[in-house]
Regions:
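Predominantly the C-terminal beta-signal and adjacent terminal strand-loop region
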Residues: 171-245
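Transmembrane beta-barrel strands of outer-membrane/channel proteins
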Residues: 32-40, 81-85, 121-129, 166, ...
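Flexible, surface-exposed loop regions and adjacent strand-edge segments
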Residues: 48-53, 95-99, 136-144, 193-201
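Gram-negative (and chloroplast) outer-membrane scaffold detector with strong preference
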Residues: 67-145, 156-160, 211-212, 217-224
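Outer-membrane beta-barrel proteins
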Residues: 41-47, 88-94, 130-136, 187-191, ...
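Membrane-spanning beta-strand positions in outer-membrane beta-barrel proteins
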Residues: 31, 76-78, 116-118, 165, ...
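Short glycine/proline- and aromatic-enriched beta-strand/turn motifs that initiate or cap beta-hairpins
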Residues: 22-71, 217-245
Length: 245
């Protein structure tokens, strides 16, 4: 899929729209956002030798989240909360953890509200309300050999993440949101022992379930206003895009 035209259009929208009255305290009170958030768990031990085609292949997602954000008047701070569904996969999904989380956090926007680009720093907490424990044994046969894997998963009840992000306002009240956080699990761990049919040695894997999380989504601020400047900026961007194309 060629994403270059979409990227060009987004950049044109950001550069063309007037921002003088984009985000003053009268026009931005609260917001909702919807995101997709793939994650990459940290693995602290992997004893599997290179001779086996068995890379860890950790990952997860795209996970889904939805939040409500309240902007504290006359400050650059906000409070945010919502729901995050997160799946962490190990061994391409042979071992996984499914988390349903209540998210609570805060953000600091340190640039002028008149800027179309709004970077922020913050802290997020994730409270897991789903089941925590899972254990079992699975086996697999394939072109790279047969193996048996015993695993144990203890999902964290709480994760804490420093975050850095950027809101890119395409219109007065609509922004593209990009966010990175390192989610540190409290009392979480995943472990496994893998034994190959041709090798009786058990190979261990361990993860504290800390993970990198990159989120991309759409934010809408309220009261919602679609201004004449937004219409003009959209038309100018489309005409410029068509001309460049």
């Amino acid at each position: 899929m060629n994403t270059r035209p979409l990227i060009v259009l987004v950049l044109l929208l950001c550069l063309s729209r007037p921002v003088a009255n984009a985000q003053d305290d009268d026009s931005r009170r609260w917001a909702i956002d919807f995101r997709l958030s793939p994650v990459k768990p940290v693995v602290t031990l992997n004893e599997t030798p290179d001779k086996y085609y068995d890379p860890i292949k950790t990952g997860g997602g795209p996970n889904f989240s939805a939040h409500i954000e309240y902007f504290i008047p006359q400050t650059g701070f906000s409070v945010v909360g919502g729901y995050d569904h997160e799946v962490m996969d190990f061994y391409s999904g042979d071992v996984s953890a499914d988390l349903s989380q209540i998210m609570l956090g805060g953000r600091w926007y340190f640039l002028s509200k008149s800027c179309a680009l709004q970077p922020y720093l913050g802290v997020s907490t994730f409270w897991n309300v789903a089941g925590r424990k899972d254990a079992g044994t699975m086996s697999m046969s394939g072109m790279y050999g047969s193996y048996e894997r015993k695993y144990s998963v203890s999902s964290p009840v709480l994760s804490v993440a420093p975050v850095v992000g950027l809101d890119i306002y395409l219109f007065s009240c609509v922004a593209l949101e990009v966010d990175y956080g390192f989610r540190m699990a409290v009392d979480g761990h995943t472990s496994s022992q893998t034994t190959y049919r041709k090798d009786a040695t058990p190979y261990a894997m361990r993860s504290p379930m800390h993970r990198h999380a990159l989120s991309v989504g759409l934010k809408v601020t309220f009261p919602f206003k679609f201004t004449n400047s937004d219409v003009t900026g959209l038309l100018d961007s489309l005409l410029t895009y068509l001309y460049l194309k």
